[in-house]
């Protein structure tokens, strides 16, 4: 059986591992260049055994089946009733079974309750995590965080640890 998994985060990796263990041929497609999903941008502990998201992602990657194909930097554009997936770049993949493991994302930047067009220097928490934890870009400060939920508090803690003034609203 050919299984197509859309999404290379924790759920996609677990699905690939399980399917390969049952003798299935597996392809995992993800829009990012690396497996791991949102875990890759999570530098805070809390993923079991006091591991960060990145450390947890690394442990998942170690268990990613060598026989599974990973197709990075690719988006599934459409899935046909004939069980053909059309991918960005013009490629097509036939499959017997489809697993959607696309995870979740925060509210799109344009949907945030900020008046006017989005000026430079305003980011979502996810964008900020990606900038800081994946690309090493540190805000010059001071930083104002709109929202004091879990992610806002995590970001405030991370920014304050760098001695950058931070305010939660």
Residue ranges with predicted function:
Residues 1-6, 57-142:
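FAD-binding core/adjacent interface of flavoenzyme oxidoreductases
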Residues 2-59, 140-169:
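Beta1-alpha1 glycine-rich phosphate/pyrophosphate-binding loop at the start
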